[in-house]
Amino acid sequence: YSPSMKYKIDFEFPVGTPWNITREVFDNAVLEAAGDVGAEIMTETRVSDFEFNGGVTVKTSKGEFHSNMVIGATGPNDKLAGMVREKRKIKPWSDNQMGTALMWEPVVGKEFVDNVYGDNRSLLVHFKPGGIEGYGWVFPKQDILNIGFGGYNRTIKSVKVKEIWEDYIKLLKKDGYFPKDQDIPPVKGAPLPLDGPIKATTMDNTLLVGDSAGMVSPLSGEGIYYGMHAGKIAINTIKKALETGDFSQKQLDQYHRDWNKVFGKELRDLSFFALMALKLPERMVYYGYRDEKLCEIFADLFLGVTPGGLGKRKPISRALYDAIRY
């Protein structure tokens, strides 16, 4: 839906895509898979500091650990990422580059989801809820609704988030997309980097992966695909470092080149497309409403269904084409 609710894009994905799963189930499955191949899982363990002295010493609430390599993958506020930034002279993210996502997964019952969202589990996206430079969403699952909204901090900080959250739930209730008798929950959220990947993701003995490195789609907020793909690339880099005994920044920079070659341009292009979509959402939804091809591109990229294929999609040139045509 466009901000005015005047224009609406309807698009039906091929059977079988996308799949929705609760984040808790997904995270636990990944954790178990790591344990199955030999990773030692340490819960309730906080990292307090890192020391580099020919290797790396990780100081935690359960003692110190020594290694040749450490990987930062704890999100945009990752302490290790801050150290890489300082070492490589990269400025911290500003409010113009950061966003906040608020999310809630209430159980509403399979009958409600079936009746309202159908067998195909229709997904909802509303642009600019409450004037925020971002979007609200509802992703139905079996008996659960994933509800949330996200946007740039530059606009979120200037409004009352609680009021916008409540207004968005009221809108969903009014339109029948949420049970009218269900209470509105307290608001809670998490930070998101929305300016594309940082310019350096390595230093001696160190790699950054996922949100810590800014590997997030500025359009959809999708980061799992990029983080997991970067993780695979990191494994190959670390294997070579172990074989040669060279854990220097120069050696590890191959990791940065490799992931950048795979999806770096995609994330940079998405940054530009997101700027167009979030700055001019009424216009962009209108173009999608008029142009079936842009509608398909928009739905695909926005919902993160086929990340890694942006180059074939050409969303920017299609949007510019529609701007001239309409």
Annotate each predicted stretch with a short phrase.
Residues 239-326:
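C-terminal helical "tail/cap" subdomain of flavin- and related membrane-associated enzymes
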Residues 49, 132, 153-237, 242-243:
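FAD/FMN-dependent oxidoreductases across multiple families
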Residues 1-29:
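A conserved beta-strand/loop capping segment in the N-terminal third of enzymes
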Residues 27, 72-75, 211:
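Acidic active-site catalytic centers that drive phospho-/nucleotidyl reactions
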Residues 32-177:
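Predominantly flavin-linked oxidoreductase catalytic cores and closely associated redox partners
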Residues 7-10, 147, 215-218:
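Short small-residue beta-strand/loop micro-motif enriched in glycine and branched aliphatics
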